[in-house]
Amino acid sequence: MRHIEFTGSEIADFEDFLRDPRAVYDPAANNGIKIRSVHLPFLPFEEIDPASGNAAVGSRFLETQRGIVKAAASVGIEIAVVHPSAEPYSEEERPERLACVIKRLSELKKITDEYGIKLAVENLPRTCIGRDIREMTAILAAIDGLYACFDTNHSLKDDNVEFVRALGSRIIALHVSDYDFINERHRMPYDGKNDWKGIMNALKEAGYSGTWNYEVSTDGRSAAEFTENYARLLENA
């Protein structure tokens, strides 16, 4: 293990990091591990949803993420991963919500540019905005210099191999796990239905050279199990 992602779902998860970024970053660095990316918070939904039509929610989203981006930049973290929306959203409101996402991420991109960090938008499942190739490519096309974080257990509409090919070189981060195509499950690769050979080859075609970041329920697993799993993925690619 050489690279990890610092992650938190809720704003409260980042209190210590905001207070003293070094206290979080240095213990990893002192053990030869680089925190390469930070996963920006997405909860509470009603407070920081970038797809919201409420201007106050949009402002809170940007204010919250600015503080975390600034802290991340101060310790040399390179990438900020962001969820494009909360949920649920109906089919009828998706165009309006997508427009809000593009507006807010455009503003967030200015903030990450200010601090020298790359911004990567993550594909999401179910009714979230960014759930399929069409919405993800629309977001990326609208914001110059925005990148993608591809989650291998989120697509419930499009084939993952085709998804990777569609996002191509815009992918600079991964969240790796397996699932049953019914809902996200965060299982170890080969414990679900993903076509791992196809995904690995599509990532090669895209020129992906970033971190292979597992986002798996540990369930008491050892570090050796992840090492063995990654070796199997490489062997079968």
Task: Describe every region a protein language model picked out.
Residues 20-31, 101-111, 163-166, 198-202:
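Catalytic-core regions built around general acid/base machinery
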Residues 4-6, 35-40, 80-82, 119-121, ...:
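Hydrophobic faces of well-ordered beta-strands that scaffold small-molecule active sites
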Residues 16, 20, 60-64, 100-104, ...:
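Soluble or luminal CAZymes and related metallo-dependent hydrolases
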Residues 1-74, 113, 147, 159, ...:
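N-terminal pre-domain/capping segments
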Residues 7-11, 40-43, 85-87, 124-126, ...:
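Active-site beta-loop-alpha junctions enriched in small/polar residues
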Residues 30, 47-147, 157:
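Active-site acidic/histidine proton-transfer and metal-coordination neighborhood
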Residues 106, 130-149, 155-237:
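Histidine-acidic metal/acid-base catalytic patches
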Residues 15-18, 49-51, 55-56, 91-97, ...:
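Short, solvent-exposed loop/turn segments at secondary-structure boundaries
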